[in-house]
Amino acid sequence: MFDCCRVPGPGLDWSVSHAKQGENGRSGHVVVFHRGRVWKLEPWQDGKLLSLDELQRQIQHIYDNTTKEYPGVGVLTASNRDIWAKDFQTLAADPQNAKILSTIHSAAFALCLDTESAPSFISHSRLLWHGAIVPHADGVRPQLGLRNRWMDKPLQFVVSADGKAGLVGEHSVMDGTPTATMCDRVLDLIASPTFAAESNSPLYANHRGSLPIPLDWSVGAATHAAMDSASDAALALINSQALNVVRTPYGKAAVKAFGVSPDGWSQMIIQLAYARLLKAKGWRRNGGTYEAASVRKFLKGRTEAIRVVSEQSDRWVASMNDPQADTKKRVSLLKDAVKTHGAYARAAGNGRGVDRHLLGLKMLVKEGEQMPAMFTDPVVKRSAYWVLSTSAIYTKNFGPYGWGEVVPDGFGVAYVAGFDDFLQFTVTSRTEMPNDEFCEELQRAAKDMYDLFADQVRKAKL
């Protein structure tokens, strides 16, 4: 999570860690990006963390001394990985640039101070996801917020011009749960009424320390051309993506009162909505639904796949679209589906899933060797074609969060089931996919499911 970075290579990336054995966190540096310029900030002085006032002074120094735009080399990190690997070698061939790269790689994390605002839920989400897009007055290549990012860093904290903040996480060596926990702990500290006073106490370095150091790239013609190409490719990718957020008028409190797991309930909303979307479009389901399970209780454990679709979930979905099925039957089938989902989730969390095992076997096949027939079987391939890539993280401080779809004709669905008064779904897809219609179906499915139990409650009161 800290003091490390993803590094591009020909055909293969790797992760470098600069964390020292026995490190207690009382040293190191942070990199700050503003208007494309890179700064090295040392938050520790003489073994003490800088006071809040001193940190503010240092960040103000960065603002005051970055009044123009600098070459946005960071956009290269959003390129196709093989292209970035080639551009990385060109960039690193210059000794000055090599030192900057080393400073970025070894930083605890990156702080990105954007010049663009995020007035809405969606604009804030997109600013975090891929940066803002600012058209040029002369109609040429727009300015991308990606110039102010380093997408290979595991942690990038982004602050927009209107003071909204968020996190961009690099997923290859890190998962969402520990980062969400970290954010909650940090924000709890900041929310404390004694935070400001304590952060300026003698426990912190209040004297004026060394100011942040600007790290300016040496950018030749080849890198300038690479930045233009990277910007064009990034803009095309950004414009190909749709994003919407759905919030229901009820949340965990109501679902638990119905005697149903909020996570299982949320997954069934997704299943019902997707089935109705397919029916409306005349499409056939051609893949599975992935939900992430944590296996962090095992040594080096990360995630396992919960295969959400089951015979029970399909039977329940069919009942919801069958006018002959009564409420009692639908409720019974829903509870069976949620019970099955819970069993699948527990099995995956206990290391009894199948997907990571199959991945391990697949990775044992050496280059040039024939892939075993099992992995080319159409049913096996279709079962792992994740048309719905879903996961749930609960944090009391996040608004929307999410990721892109994992297959061209699929959806990414990040949901939150931990709030008492609403459930939230962040839905991403290619723009050619019916994202708006899927979100409408999510809202309809959520209402129909609520009405099943609300009807029961009304009858019980009578």
Language-model segments: which ranges?
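Acyl-CoA-dependent O-acyltransferases
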Residues: M1-Q156, A161-L462
